Amino acid sequence: MDYLSRRKFIKLTGLGFMSLGIGHFAPIAFAQTHVLKVYKSPSCGCCGAWVSHMRSAGFRVVVANIADLRPIKKKFRVAPELRACHTAVIDGYVIEGHVPAREVIRLLKDRPKAIGLAVPGMPIGSPGMEQGGRRDPFQVILFSSTDRLVFAEYPQQEV
């Protein structure tokens, strides 16, 4: 390899590594452009853990501690069968329950016509509900006033 081709090789290799790094941080950079407002009970630990999960993914999070969340869920049109412990809003979408950050990022990038995403109930192993390596299966539901579609599925995982 002569000097010129070595230089090109080093530059190209460096650019390749830089692009890998940029790709790794791209979701975080994207998330930082959006503010997530979370309505939760002041005493709920799993809601606080989900907030930490979202912050770790790069979201700017504002928390509103509210004793009775039923009026919030009704205001944001979350059907009773989709409800969980906390409700969040971001960029015109509702996020109900322990939705993984990567699904919220996908929602914001794809911008489907919907009210939002929900993980009904409180499935073990969903973000904020971690218990060791165990994960119960759960689905992330994309919902509108008339439809519900499976947006993502997370299979069961044992320790």
Regions found by a protein language model. Name each.
Residues V35-L36, F59-R60, D91-V94:
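Short active-site oxyanion
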Residues Y39-S41, I66-A67, H98, P120-M122:
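Active-site-proximal beta-strand/loop segments in catalytic clefts of secreted hydrolases
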